[in-house]
Amino acid sequence: MKVMEKKKRDWNSLSIITIITIILLTPCLTSELWVTVYYGVPVWHDADPVLFCASDAKAHSTEAHNIWATQACVPTDPSPQEVFLPNVIESFNMWKNNMVDQMHEDIISLWDQSLKPCVKLTPLCVTLQCSKANFSQAKNLTNQTSSPPLEMKNCSFNVTTELRDKKKQVYSLFYVEDVVNLGNENNTYRIINCNTTAITQACPKTSFEPIPIHYCAPAGFAILKCNDKDFSGKGKCTNVSTVHCTHGIKPVVTTQLLINGSLAEGNITVRVENKSKNTDVWIVQLVEAVSLNCHRPGNNTRGEVQIGPGMTFYNIENVVGDTRSAYCKINGTTWNRTVEEVKKALATSSNRTAANITLNRASGGDPEVTHHMFNCGGEFFYCNTSQIFTDNITNGIIILPCRIRQIVSSWMRVGRGIYAPPIRGNITCNSNITGLLLTSDTPVTNNSGNLTFRPTGGNMKDIWRSELYKYKVVRIEPLSVAPTKARRHTVARQKDRQKRAAFGLGALFLGFLGAAGSTMGAAAVTLTVQARQLLSGIVQQQNNLLKAIEAQQHLLQLSIWGVKQLQARLLAVERYLQDQQILGLWGCSGKAVCYTTVPWNNSWPGSNSTDDIWGNLTWQQWDKLVSNYTGKIFGLLEEAQSQQEKNERDLLELDQWASLWNWFDITKWLWYIKIFLMAVGGIIGLRIIMTVFSVVRRVRQGYSPLSLQTLIPVQREQGRLGEIDEGGGEQDRSRSVRLVEGCLPLIWDDLRNLGIWSYQSLTSLACNVWRQLKTLGHLILHSLRLLRERLCLLGGIIQYWGKELKISAISLLDATAIAVAEGTDRIIEAFQVTLRIIRNIPRRIRQGLERALL
């Protein structure tokens, strides 16, 4: 019996363990997916932030670019970094790149700042009385290196003196092309474009010598760089890297020829937005630079004329030689080879052969378009390029005749002009031709026919595009959601007091995007490190900037515009704080991976198979799939967190019972008195109800109480002797109901009875629950036993029928084999009989003939 009872107890324990295991494993067997928040994923979107510039400007230099760079740019990073992104394919479009617009605005700001302190030539919009000027030309200039001399006019005009109410007459030399005749009078002139253009005189020390400028993205943003050779500037790029800043770009303002730019890698590259439009510019990037050496010989005497209070006009007092005559030299052999390669590249781009491509001179337009215009040593050169844009290019030294203009149309805005004061002495500048700006006479619509390309210019954005074609700015979006099988543990009956650990700072900012080409599963492993890199990169960039400014504090002079660019770098810190605020609204503050209670909807991407998205997709690809649902998911996360906080608040109210010391707080005594009075009232009411129920029960049994305060003795049985003094006889068995007197004994008696009753009730309830659990355990155990028996029976049946089927199959195969063998034997025997009959036919004929003869 003891052994049976022990086995019974073991079976009961086993049944309870089985029930608990089933209850715990039931949630694990479900395949429902839940929303999981990931912070630090390598995801980005196209953006147009305010970029800031960096340069190695020298504050002691008076050149305009240096002055502007010291006031608008920060020092360059001494250790620039570039991180390649494997397995990343990104789209670029040089024709719709906000970086070009920003650089264009910056160069306009540079020129405006260079011309801002200089004199407006509005007072010179007066009538000029001019006559032909006679002076001796220099004899050292040949016809090969100079243009034909131009006639000069000696003009007199009235200007305001230091006293505004008085005027005086002054004299100045002007070339004929800088003045326009008025009316029919031969001696009356005015300055060209004076009535339609606001002309600003450039400062005498302005040289416009460009220095390399780097464009950098603020922290929280990144610059993606396409490293594909022969990249057309638009489309997919497979070799992508991320950088802090671009390479150094020299903002050279020029037309027709690209000077001192970057060279192509591999082959000459041709880039055009729309080939079917003959107005679009074809940007040609060379592989090998061609030297361009320009020189302005001669000398002149520059004078100063006061044209008003505090306004000085720098004029030409005397001329020695033709100071407006200049020339540029190009190696004809190198240029001829370059032109042939350019023709091949244009032919390949337009689906033609090189024989169908022709280069010709500019057809017409403004002087800035028909000539190669550029600034050399503070003077604006206008060079005739008809000798190099032709099919008959000499192999010797090609000399391009140039002219220097004093009044130049401004490329920055319509209706503006620049007066360049004459520069003393010889001017020489050596440059490198790195590209061409061309237009086609006819649209490229088919694969046949000849094409003629001509040099063009005027839109300076094309120059910036030739350098920024391989860059784009993106905004890093480190916050993403994805489906997983894990669910957040929510508050049920006890307060979750687990503290979230804050992660530290470290690593590099660019390394954050290093896992962009990895799958979601591989990148998710390093989310904590990437989240650290995100904020660490922001802090590191700020520290690098502050160190660079501190190191060059005596050189750096930030203007208001420069401070604005500097403040743009603080945008990333604000974005990081915003992301942390959003994570806080979802209950995920300080976590790189945060599980939630929001179920993943079956209509959302990735609901069918999570293994496919985690093993095959990158975070960038996944973000494109789920981008249409993120708004709804974010809203559900906020609602779930609000409900979670409500549950925690409700539970927090019960958490006051956790501290016993709070029970003795004097502020809660009134609450204790109230509870005591309510308890006493409840006990008294319960006592009255129990008394009434007791009286009713006894009355129903035939009992009529005389008084509730009188002891009622129980009648003694007849025939019994009473108790005597000597102790004889039987003890009296009469009893009386115990009467409790006083308030406290009454309360104690009621509490005792209530406690006993509660204990008995709870004990009975516990016993019933235990019996039910044992019954349920026996039932489950019995069910499992029956299931095992049924499975064993099913296995036996399957084994039996499998054996029978095997035997039947073998028998069928044997019978088939026997039948086939017998049939084959009969066929062979019949065939043999037929052959014997055929073989015996001659014998039978012979035997018949023998019988006939006999």
From Swiss-Prot:
Residues 501-522 are annotated as: Fusion peptide. One of its GO terms (biological process) is positive regulation of plasma membrane raft polarization. The keyword Signal applies. CDD domains: HIV-1-like_HR1-HR2 (cd09909). Residues 130-154 are annotated as: V1. Residues 362-372 are annotated as: CD4-binding loop. Residues 294-327 are annotated as: V3. Residues 155-194 are annotated as: V2. Residues 624-658 form a coiled coil. This is Envelope glycoprotein gp160. A motif (Di-leucine internalization motif) lies at residues 853-854. Inhibitors targeting HIV-1 viral envelope proteins are used as antiretroviral drugs. Attachment of virions to the cell surface via non-specific interactions and CD4 binding can be blocked by inhibitors that include cyanovirin-N, cyclotriazadisulfonamide analogs, PRO 2000, TNX 355 and PRO 542. In addition, BMS 806 can block CD4-induced conformational changes. Env interactions with the coreceptor molecules can be targeted by CCR5 antagonists including SCH-D, maraviroc (UK 427857) and aplaviroc (GW 873140), and the CXCR4 antagonist AMD 070. Keywords: AIDS, Apoptosis, Clathrin-mediated endocytosis of virus by host, Cleavage on pair of basic residues, Coiled coil, Disulfide bond, Fusion of virus membrane with host endosomal membrane, Fusion of virus membrane with host membrane, Glycoprotein, Host cell membrane, Host endosome, Host membrane, Host-virus interaction, Lipoprotein, Membrane, Palmitate, Signal, Transmembrane, Transmembrane helix, Viral attachment to host cell, Viral envelope protein, Viral immunoevasion, Viral penetration into host cytoplasm, Virion, Virus endocytosis by host, Virus entry into host cell. The lineage of its organism: Viruses, Riboviria, Pararnavirae, Artverviricota, Revtraviricetes. Some of the most genetically diverse regions of the viral genome are present in Env. They are called variable regions 1 through 5 (V1 through V5). Coreceptor usage of gp120 is determined mainly by the primary structure of the third variable region (V3) in the outer domain of gp120. The sequence of V3 determines which coreceptor, CCR5 and/or CXCR4 (corresponding to R5/macrophage, X4/T cell and R5X4/T cell and macrophage tropism), is used to trigger the fusion potential of the Env complex, and hence which cells the virus can infect. Binding to CCR5 involves a region adjacent in addition to V3. The membrane proximal external region (MPER) present in gp41 is a tryptophan-rich region recognized by the antibodies 2F5, Z13, and 4E10. MPER seems to play a role in fusion. The record marks 500-501 as: Cleavage. Residues 697-854 are cytoplasmic.
